[in-house]
Amino acid sequence: DQAEVKRVAESLEGQLTATLQMDDGDLDAARAHIQRGRALDPEDRYLRHLYADFLLAESRPDAAIDVLEDYVDQDGALLRLAIAAIDAGDRRADRWAQQFRDRMAAAQRSAEYAHLRELARFTLVVEDDPAEALALARANWRTQKEPADMHIYLAAARAAGEPGAADEVRTFIAEHGVQDSRLAPFLDNGTEAGS
């Protein structure tokens, strides 16, 4: 039906616009597009996760938990819940982290595609294992080259004390003219900021 097609198209447009505005650092505009998209389709998983990431970036972990806590059956929501709970000092952090670990282990045992970017983020932020996060980010980079993939690779390299390990990301950014405000803290004339 035409109304459904229009709603889906508007939701996808809102997702893309909000993502681009977050990349550009225009958080007010991103918030407006996320809210508009969520009004059109409150069950849109991508928008829900994008909104939670937005709230985490604004240091509002309790709000991120409120958005996600009814969706613990989704791996992406569970990852963000574990991160938000740690940031908020929420007692459920350990439980959500263990559930995410268990799911990733089950996916690896069953030879299902493990979401390496999400696993790298979890390993870096929740497990506090930069070396393993770097290995996962590197494996993810072989097939995924979105700004979020660049961010986790650069963050893991910095945290592992190996900024040069992410030189291939810097080269890719320079060659493709990637513009994303989230990457700026990791870049300074081709080197890690602060290194």
Regions inferred by a protein language model and the residue ranges of each:
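Terminal, low-structured helical/coil segments at or just beyond the last alpha-helical repeat
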Residues: 113-118, 122, 126-127, 165-195
